[in-house]
Amino acid sequence: AMFAPFQLAGIVAISGYVYFFEEWKKSLKPSAFQTPWLITHGLEDDLLPVVTTRNQVQKLKDVGLPITWKEFMKDHEIDLHVETSFIRKWVRSKMVRTRRPTYLPPDQTSSSNSKQRFKSF
């Protein structure tokens, strides 16, 4: 997302880390500064300590990336109740209604499962 030549709708990163290379700041594309980010992490994560990721997120914020940072009382996992609810609300808040066609997966009960369907908003 930081190096994509086009703007993404948003980024959700869960219990991860950022690999910083020597020239990473100079390689950022302008679109990276327009892409909203949500980064979540567990306070009890023993695999990737929260302090490390918290410091990495601060580096990203310091260069101006629009990041929402959220810590949860969890290990290196996805909290299926509190965290997914928070993510769902964040994604919905970033969605923009457009007139562009959006792919919808085929209805599993439909006989036309192999056909792609599109919906315009």
Please describe what each predicted stretch is.
Residues 1-5:
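Short glycine-enriched nucleophile-adjacent loop
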Residues 10-96:
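The feature captures the conserved acid-bearing segment of alpha/beta-hydrolase catalytic domains
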Residues 82-121:
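Catalytic active-site module of serine/aspartate enzymes centered on a nucleophile-bearing elbow/loop
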